[in-house]
């Protein structure tokens, strides 16, 4: 074991920077200037081609903003497939989520960054690292702005991280993967039940659906 700013860690752990890890770090504005985004991205409050994933949606578990196919294609540098690590970098700085797998295409919203590790075994380690006390302290240490706290991708990429050797990382992944898969399954079931509720409730209120004969 060796003493570090994060406490004692195994000597086999490597000290690296986030930007040196084999992963994609991107955000909404990676797709173009603010003028280009305004001209090419249209948001909808009603159902459309793809979900526009925001920090507030990830917090609430409800996804109610959409983009059309043209906007989705324009935002190709921030496409989401599910399982990416998402971190809020404006306003509510440091909120960390795993992107859920939803029932249609998804694209990253504004004021958040997305991390997509090339190694699947890195995903949960990084998620837990950034939610952990010291990971959060590092993120809070790079935020600036008086009116609205924020941090940029460059500063984030320069943050230090201790990485286990590949063998230990793989063992860790095998232990936690079933746990996260169960969480994802439960979230999917909740999404399905919420959609069913939203579809049936208006019919019940209008009288189109009659449940008076159901024996409870």
Task: Enumerate the predicted regions with their spans.
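Hydrophobic/basic alpha-helical segments
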Residues: 123, 134-137, 174, 181
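Glycine-rich beta->alpha junctions and the first turn(s) of the following alpha-helix
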Residues: 113, 124, 140, 160-163, ...
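Short, charged, low-complexity amphipathic alpha-helix
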Residues: 144-149, 154-174, 213-216
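Non-catalytic DNA-recognition/assembly elements of restriction-modification systems
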Residues: 1-35, 158, 162, 166-208
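A short beta-sheet element
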Residues: 54-55, 74-135, 142-147, 152-153
């Amino acid at each position: 074991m060796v003493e570090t700013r994060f406490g004692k860690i195994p000597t086999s752990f490597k000290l690296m920077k986030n930007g040196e890890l084999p992963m994609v770090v991107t955000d909404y504005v990676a797709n173009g200037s603010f003028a280009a985004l305004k001209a090419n991205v249209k948001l909808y409050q009603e159902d459309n081609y793809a979900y526009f994933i925001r920090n507030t949606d990830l917090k609430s578990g409800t996804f109610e903003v959409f983009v059309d196919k043209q906007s989705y294609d324009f935002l190709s540098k921030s496409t989401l497939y599910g399982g990416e690590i998402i971190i809020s970098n404006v306003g509510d700085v440091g909120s960390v989520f795993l992107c859920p797998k939803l029932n249609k295409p998804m694209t990253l919203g504004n004021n958040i960054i997305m991390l997509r590790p090339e190694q699947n075994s890195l995903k949960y380690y990084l998620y837990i690292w950034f939610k952990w006390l010291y990971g959060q302290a590092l993120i809070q240490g790079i935020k600036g702005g008086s009116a609205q706290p924020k941090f940029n991708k460059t500063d984030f990429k320069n943050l230090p991280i201790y990485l286990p050797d590949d063998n230990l990382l793989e063992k860790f992944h095998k232990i936690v993967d079933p746990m996260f898969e169960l969480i994802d399954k439960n979230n999917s079931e909740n999404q399905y039940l919420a959609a069913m509720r939203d579809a049936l409730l208006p019919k019940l209120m209008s009288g189109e659906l009659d449940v008076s004969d159901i024996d409870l």
